[in-house]
C-alpha cells in the first residue's frame, strides 16, 4: 500500500513526499512472568517504533528513527526499559547491513542484546519479519534485511559481566559470528513468532 501511494504521488510531481516502506528488520521482544519486583507483569518492548524508514525519491531513508505506524516514535531510554522489565541491556547498536541498497539506500535498523535477570520465571517471545523480504524499494531498490532471533539460554553472560570480562555485543560477520563465544543453549529462528 505505501508503495502504491508513493508511486501515485510521484506521478503527480510531488517527489519530496515519496517514501518507501520500511522492512521491520528488527525484532519486538515481548513476554511476561514475574518481574524484578516480584510482581506479575507483561511487557512489549516498543523499540520497534524506531525502525529505519525506506528510501525517499530524492534522499536516503531515515536510520532507526520512527515507524510508519508511529511517525514520532523513538526507542526509549534503555534505563527506562530496565526499570519496567527484568531486562538488563548489554548493547543497543546500529544493525549492520540492514538498510536496503539502491540509488538511495533505505534506513538502517538497530539490534539489542538483553539479559533477562532478577526473575524466577519469565517467558520471552520474539516478533519480527523473518523468511521474506516484504518491502522492496519503490522504483527498483532492494529490500532491507529480514529479522532473525538468536536466543541463548542458561548462558555465561552474567558471570562474564561480574568478572569484568569482555563479551560480544553483536553477531559480527557471517564467517566468524561473535555471539558463538557465549556458552549456552541456543535458539535461532526466522519465524514471525518464536
Residue ranges and their predicted role:
Residues 1-194:
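Glycine/proline-enriched, intrinsically flexible loops and inter-domain linkers
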Amino acid at each position: 500500500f505505501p508503495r502504491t501511494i508513493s508511486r501515485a504521488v510521484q506521478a503527480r510531481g510531488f517527489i519530496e513526499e515519496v517514501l518507501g516502506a520500511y522492512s521491520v528488520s528488527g525484532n519486538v521482544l515481548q513476554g511476561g512472568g514475574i518481574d524484578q519486583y516480584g510482581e506479575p507483569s507483561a511487557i512489549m518492548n516498543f523499540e520497534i517504533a524506531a525502525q529505519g524508514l525506506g528510501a525517499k525519491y530524492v534522499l536516503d531513508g531515515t536510520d532507526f528513527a520512527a515507524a510508519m505506524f508511529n511517525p514520532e516514535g523513538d526507542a526509549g531510554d534503555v534505563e527506562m526499559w530496565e526499570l519496567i522489565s527484568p531486562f538488563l541491556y548489554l548493547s543497543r547498536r546500529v544493525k549492520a547491513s540492514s538498510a536496503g541498497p539502491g540509488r538511495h539506500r533505505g534506513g538502517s535498523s538497530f539490534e539489542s542484546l538483553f539479559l533477562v535477570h532478577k526473575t524466577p520465571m519469565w517467558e520471552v517471545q520474539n516478533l519480527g519479519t523473518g523468511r521474506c523480504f516484504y518491502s522492496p524499494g519503490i522504483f527498483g531498490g532492494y529490500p532491507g534485511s529480514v529479522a532473525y532471533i538468536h536466543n541463548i539460554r542458561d548462558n555465561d553472560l552474567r558471570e562474564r559481566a561480574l568478572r569484568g570480562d569482555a563479551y560480544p555485543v553483536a553477531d559480527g560477520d557471517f564467517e566468524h559470528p561473535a555471539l558463538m563465544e557465549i556458552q549456552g543453549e541456543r535458539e535461532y529462528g526466522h519465524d514471525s513468532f518464536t
